[in-house]
Regions:
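Zinc-dependent metallopeptidase catalytic helix centered on the HExxH motif
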Residues: 1-48, 337
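Non-catalytic accessory/interaction domains
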Residues: 3, 41, 55-57, 66-73, ...
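Flexible loop/turn segments at secondary-structure boundaries
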Residues: 13-16, 26-28, 36, 74, ...
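Short, solvent-exposed loop/turn segments at the edges of secondary structure
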Residues: 21-24, 50, 59-61, 86-87, ...
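Short linear capping/connector segments at secondary-structure termini
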Residues: 48-49, 108-111
Length: 359
């Protein structure tokens, strides 16, 4: 609400189709300000779950653009949803990391100063971000705001080149001819080099600076990445070098790739096994959702046994009993892991412990 003093009050959208200028910015700024003041809350990590909510809605054929023409009060109310808030804020974060924090700040400052006590269209923001950076944001950003959905980017190594291809991601496996101007941050895990690319066509060839590219350096892009089997195995060798957000995105992207048959179940399960020792509650929230979906598709006791074994290492560290010395994050993590183990492992002694507590 404090952020709305600038985004919504000082500068106000001209019409309801631009409500994302208020709400997406407020959602982003609350994280930026809180992270600067209370870094121990790790709110950037929380944005992973917000983006996942946006993915879930935007992967459906019934999705809508972040910005669309509003003609009735009912349509105005429809704007206040996960696409305006969660997708809008993470798209802004994606462009902040692509053009650079200082360039992004400069563009936003100029936007607020130029249009203070006035009303704006989205194009006014895009033009200021274009002026502040080396990229034509006024051509790139509309592909994310004016059309529904988002892409999945396929990655291939071809001799000395890197081939990137895009298609629209839909959870039912279908697609259409939508294209995005995709800002891509790449980190080469083997050479430690980084570079930025802009994928504007269905498929493009780029020069590569290493053999093990991790797409979406930092983990903030609003698209999925599908790696070849060979690349996924190579990236797995550098798993410990990825930060929390990158690990989250690697698992989420691979899970979504599996769901539309772009990677094999064997490759996905090999990757998933690397996460059993992770201590981030958001990663475990993602893992819990994955196992829940798997079990709905294949409700077999062998899968339940696998899930139980997956949880064991973390349970041994966390324990099942509440501790006053635990941090908030550790308490939340214990709740997630214990709940997952209790639901699928068929460990009666473990479950009876919690039944006794309840009674």
């Amino acid at each position: 609400e404090l952020a709305h003093m600038w985004f919504g009050d000082l500068v106000t959208m001209k019409w309801w189709d631009g409500i994302w200028l208020n709400e997406a910015f407020a959602s982003l700024m609350e994280v930026i300000a809180s992270e600067a003041t209370y870094p121990e809350f790790k709110l950037w990590n929380e944005l992973n779950l917000a983006r996942s909510q946006g993915f879930n809605v935007d992967s459906l054929k019934s999705s809508r653009p972040v910005e669309f023409e509003v003609a009735t009060p009912e349509e105005a109310e429809e704007m206040f949803d996960v696409l305006t808030y969660q997708k809008g804020s993470t798209v802004l974060r994606m462009f902040e990391t692509f053009i650079g924090e200082e360039n992004f700040k400069s563009g936003v400052r100029n936007y607020l100063k130029k249009y203070q006590y006035k009303n704006t269209h989205s194009t006014d923001l895009w033009n200021e971000l274009t002026e502040a950076s080396e990229y034509e944001i006024n051509k790139i950003l509309p592909t994310w705001i004016k059309q529904e959905g988002y892409p999945i980017v396929s990655v291939e190594i071809q001799d000395a080149s890197l081939k990137l291809s895009q298609r629209k991601f839909l959870i039912d496996g279908s697609t259409d001819d939508s294209l995005w101007h995709i800002p891509i941050n790449i980190k080469y895990l083997d050479t430690k080099s980084e570079n930025k690319l802009l994928l504007e066509n269905e498929s493009e060839i780029f020069e590569r600076k290493g053999s093990v590219p991790y797409i979406n350096n930092g983990g903030w892009a609003f698209f999925h990445t599908a790696y070849s089997s060979e690349l996924l195995q190579e990236i797995s060798l550098y798993f410990k070098e990825l930060d929390i957000n990158e690990k989250y995105r690697l698992l989420e992207d691979s899970w979504m790739s599996l769901r539309i048959n772009q990677i094999s179940l064997d490759d996905f399960m090999d990757l998933l096994a690397l996460y059993k020792h992770e201590k981030d509650k958001n990663i475990w929230t993602l893992v819990s959702g994955i196992f829940s979906t798997m079990y709905k598709i294949y409700p077999d006791k062998n899968l339940g046994t696998f899930i139980g074994k997956f949880c064991k290492p973390s349970l041994e560290v966390l324990g099942k009993e509440y501790s006053e010395n635990s941090s908030q994050e550790e308490s939340q993590l214990r709740s997630i892991v214990c709940g997952l183990y209790a639901k699928y492992s068929n460990d009666k002694e473990f479950n009876n412990y919690f039944v006794d507590l309840f009674e």
